UniProtKB/Swiss-Prot annotation:
The gene is RPC53. GO terms for cellular component: nucleoplasm; nucleus; RNA polymerase III complex. It comes from the Eukaryota. Pfam families: RNA_pol_Rpc4. It comes from Saccharomyces cerevisiae (strain ATCC 204508 / S288c) (Baker's yeast). A motif (Nuclear localization signal) lies at residues 25-29. Belongs to the eukaryotic RPC4/POLR3D RNA polymerase subunit family. The modification Phosphoserine is found at residues 137-138, 178, 182, 224. This is DNA-directed RNA polymerase III subunit RPC4. DNA-dependent RNA polymerase catalyzes the transcription of DNA into RNA using the four ribonucleoside triphosphates as substrates. Specific peripheric component of RNA polymerase III which synthesizes small RNAs, such as 5S rRNA and tRNAs. Essential for tRNA synthesis. The RPC53/RPC4-RPC37/RPC5 subcomplex is required for terminator recognition and reinitiation. The lineage of its organism: Eukaryota, Fungi, Dikarya, Ascomycota, Saccharomycotina. GO terms for biological process: termination of RNA polymerase III transcription; transcription by RNA polymerase III; transcription initiation at RNA polymerase III promoter; tRNA transcription by RNA polymerase III. The keyword Acetylation does not apply. The keyword Hydrolase does not apply.
């Protein structure tokens, strides 16, 4: 037991290790490795060894690539390099671009493909010879080729992407068929036409420039019918000042003369005739509007029109009656008519008194369409007032002491401004 028993504590590890025996030193779990520096001779030997390994690996890769591009031909097992233009290519056996049935003349694996149909054509033969020449040049370039001096010109292949001149093809074909045809006797034009037929089997119709007019005329005579009526007349040009323009100018001159006779420049205090005509048009439009409003008020009794009068009105005077003097003169000459004249006078006075109740003037409509107001013996002009955007009602108020009342008479429909003629 440890000495800490009396204290009530657990024994510590140090106490237990010290009691159990000698203290063991902790050992490292990962020990560093001491790397010794190589000498110069060892480093050079290692570098040369790595270099040799890389060169051997590069040679193996090159040999593998060359073997991949070679194909075994015949029983001798000779390896020949395949032409570069045939890499990543394949023969189409069906479809519009199919190569058809292919045969080989010698039966070896490295053989040219020749279509059985039309294989004797000079174009095919020329292409095969060119391919063989290209294959021979590619064979000379190969480093690991065993048979460098062997040339297989008899091999026949298709031209895959190479071009030839048309003259060379035609010359080859002419050389091959010299025994069967008489091409020697052909002149330049026939030889050129034959070459064009070989290149372009379907010849387009060509027309010389000097024959264009003749061809057009011949086609028109063959397809078009003769006209049965006269040709369409051309557009007729007339001077601008005739017809309607002259009539308008005459009417404008007449209107200006009438305006000058009326003397509207002084009435409207305008500068020129155009301004006077514009003022006259506005005045006529106002009078027509007022006349329509008055007719509408006559049909609808509950409609009223507001008249804006000047602040000072002329004194209303009863018109003098000349008939009274004439009646007094005729009383002595014709006593039998005295009673009738007296009755007529009484009736006129009675009517005049009734008409004057609440009436201060009248609106007159002239033959020209102009409107005017006559108040007493004074004639005034009228014009259209400003329209309101809200409703206005006319109300009659009674302010009697015993009982006051208000009565709605109707609605205001328009406004007229009365101006005196100065």
């Amino acid at each position: 037991m440890s000495s800490n028993k009396g204290n009530g504590r657990l024994p510590s590890l140090k106490d237990s290790s010290s009691n159990g025996g000698g203290s063991a030193k902790p050992s490292l779990k990962f020990k560093p490795k001491a790397v010794a520096r190589k000498s110069k001779e060892e480093r050079e030997a290692a570098a040369s060894k790595v270099k040799l390994e890389e060169e051997s690996k590069r040679g193996n890769d090159k040999k593998h690539f060359n073997n991949k591009n070679k194909r075994v031909t015949g029983a001798g097992g000779q390896q020949r390099r395949m032409a570069k233009y045939l890499n990543n290519t394949h023969v189409i056996s069906s479809g519009p671009l199919a190569a058809g049935n292919f045969v080989s003349e010698k039966g070896d694996l490295r053989r040219g493909f020749i279509k059985s149909e039309g294989s004797g054509s000079s174009l095919v033969q020329k292409g095969l010879e060119t391919i063989d020449n290209g294959a021979e040049s590619s064979e000379n370039e190969a480093e690991d080729d065993d048979n460098e001096g062997v040339a297989s010109k008899s091999k026949k292949k298709f031209n895959m992407g190479k071009e030839f001149e048309a003259r060379n093809l035609i010359e080859d074909e002419d050389d091959g068929e010299s025994e069967k045809s008489s091409d020697v006797d052909m002149d330049d034009e026939e030889w050129r036409s034959k070459r064009i037929e070989q290149l372009f089997p379907v010849r387009p119709v060509r027309v010389r420039h000097e024959d264009v007019e003749t061809v057009k005329r011949e086609i028109q005579e063959a397809l078009s019918e003769k006209p049965t009526r006269e040709p369409t007349p051309s557009v007729k040009t007339e001077p601008v000042g005739t017809g309607l323009q002259s009539y308008l100018e005459e009417r404008e001159r007449q209107v200006n003369e009438k305006l000058a006779d009326l003397g509207l420049e002084k009435e409207f205090q305008s500068v020129d005739g155009k301004e006077a005509a514009a003022e006259l048009e506005l005045l006529n439009a106002d009078h027509q509007h007022i006349l329509r409003k008055l007719k509408k008020m006559n049909n609808k009794p509950e409609r009223f029109m507001v008249f804006q009068l000047p602040t000072r009105l002329p004194a209303f005077e009863r018109p003098a009656v000349k008939e009274e003097k004439e009646d007094m003169e005729t009383q002595a000459s014709d006593p039998s008519k005295k009673k009738k004249n007296i009755k007529k006078k009484d009736t006129k006075d009675a009517l005049s008194t009734r008409e004057l109740a609440g009436k201060v003037g009248s609106i007159r409509v002239h033959k020209s369409g102009k409107l005017s107001v006559k108040i007493g013996n004074v004639v005034m002009d009228i014009g259209k007032g400003a329209e309101t955007t809200f409703l206005q009602d006319v109300i009659a108020l009674s302010i009697a002491d015993d009982a006051s009342s208000a009565e709605l008479l109707g609605r205001v429909d328009g406004k007229i401004v009365v101006t005196p003629q100065i």
